[in-house]
């Protein structure tokens, strides 16, 4: 087998929360809402450029979780541009952010939480200033 790279990740939640997640990942993280195949369940596919990277899938109330779903997820990271504008947008929305960096690389990391508490990293490789 040859691994060709990252395809997407999926978050599953009830519809009312799914709409909040969609708004967060579009308005805060900067993903774009895009086409989704006509599955029987409702949901959204969010894109970074031409690549679908986040699938939001409806879980019906009381629906059991699959056995392979684990509580070990820590965060997902997105490569981004526009650090200053992003920090201003997050501050204006009152979103709590932890700023960090990767030693020896110049990478700036912003860590935050989505409406369900999932970790999100916004990663910037651009020089500050």
Model feature map: region roles:
Residues 69-90:
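Mid-chain, well-packed structural core segment of small domains
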Residues 12, 77-81, 113:
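Short hydrophobic/aromatic beta-strand micro-patches
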Residues 1-4, 92-129:
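Vicinal oxygen chelate
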Residues 39-43, 72, 104-108:
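Short acidic/glycine-enriched loop/turn segments that link adjacent beta-strands
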Residues 1-22, 74-76, 128-129:
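N-terminal beta-strand motif that seeds the catalytic metal site of vicinal oxygen chelate
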Residues 11-53:
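Core segments of cupin and vicinal oxygen chelate
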Residues 23, 89-93:
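Short amphipathic alpha-helices in soluble, non-transmembrane regions
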Residues 53, 59-61:
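Short, conserved turn/kink motifs that form compact alpha/beta structural patches or helix kinks used as
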């Amino acid at each position: 087998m040859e691994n060709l790279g990252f395809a997407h990740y999926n978050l599953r939640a009830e519809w009312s929360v799914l709409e909040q997640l969609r708004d967060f990942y579009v308005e805060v993280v900067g993903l774009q809402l895009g086409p989704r195949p006509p599955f029987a369940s409702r949901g959204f596919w969010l894109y970074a450029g031409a690549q679908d990277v986040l699938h939001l899938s409806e879980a019906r109330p009381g629906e059991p979780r699959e056995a392979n779903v684990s509580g070990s997820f820590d965060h997902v990271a997105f490569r981004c541009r526009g650090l200053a504008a992003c920090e201003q947008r997050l501050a204006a929305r009152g979103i709590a952010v932890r700023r960090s960096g990767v030693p020896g690389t110049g990478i700036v990391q912003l860590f935050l939480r989505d409406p369900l508490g999932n970790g999100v990293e916004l990663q910037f490789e651009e020089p500050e200033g």
